[in-house]
Each structure stands twice: as C-alpha cells, then as structure tokens.
Amino acid sequence: AKAEGDSVGGIFEIIATGLPYGLGSHTQWDKKLHARITESIMSVNAFKGIEIGMGFEEAEKLGSEVHDEIGWDGEKYIRHSNNAGGIEGGMSNAQPIVIRAVMKPIPTLIKPLRSVDIETKEDKLAHKERTDSCSVPAASIVAESMLCFVLADALLEKFGGDTMEQMKAHINISGNY
C-alpha cells in the first residue's frame, strides 16, 4: 500500500485481565460495561466496528456453542470458556475482557482520489499530504487507553475509596476473583 501511495486499515485486539466480577450494570442502559467500552472506543476517529468475545461469530453458532458454562474449582466459580469476552449481562464476570476493533484505512493519501473544488465545482484531485500507510498500531494504543478510562471509572463506581490503598482494600474484602 505504501509503495502505491495508498493506506490500509486493520483489526487489533485488546485483552484486560485481573478484573473483578460485577463491574457495570445489568439494569441501567448507560452503565452497562459493554456499552461504555463500545462508546469510548468507537468515539475514536476511523474506528468502524467492535466485537467483544466471540463477537460476530456468534451469529453463525447455536446457543450451546456460544454460552460459557460455569463450574466450581473448589474455591471460586469459573467459566469453562470465555466466548462472552469477560462481559455478561452488562457486567464483568472476572474473565479476561477481550475486545477486537476494526479501523478503516486513513483517508490521507499520497496518491490522491478524485474530488471537486467547492468554489469552482471543477473536478480536482484531493490535496496530497504526508501520511502513514497504516495507523492501526498507534490507534490500538489509543483504544487501550480509552478502555483503561472506562475500567478505572467502573472500578471507582463499584469499590470507591479516596486512595488506591483504600480501593485495593475494598476489592480484596469483596470477593475471591
């Protein structure tokens, strides 16, 4: 693409681990964890889609192939798979949160596309600019940061505290994750 003066998009994955169950809400539309994550990541320019866990593959599967079975390991509840991507019913389930997002090719091209001069209405080529042929690696870091903001906010809502030490203490006494 770079040699041709073009650009490419791509798909990246973010995995958040070590989170407790119960972040988010199963009742309030604006507090559901998957909705908050999606809103924050999709607010970044050029991101065009997001999936959590198995995501769009679920459309081709039966419920018995999608839903994660629950077990007991002698100390805590576990899931035998993580097709839900760490979020069920709007809340975290203590499994890794797995997110994939797609970014479109960036629009600035060294080999410009056809356009129209808005003053003269004449056909023109778009302005040539210095550009990267692929911004997906950099954009994935931005998306990871957006996810961190959402998770930090959800942790504060659930556990509170004036300091990190207080919040860690609240997390430690609330359950075995």
Residue ranges and their predicted role:
Residues 3-122:
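Glycine-rich anion/phosphate-binding loop at the beta-strand->alpha-helix junction
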Residues 108-177:
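Internal helix-turn-beta structural module
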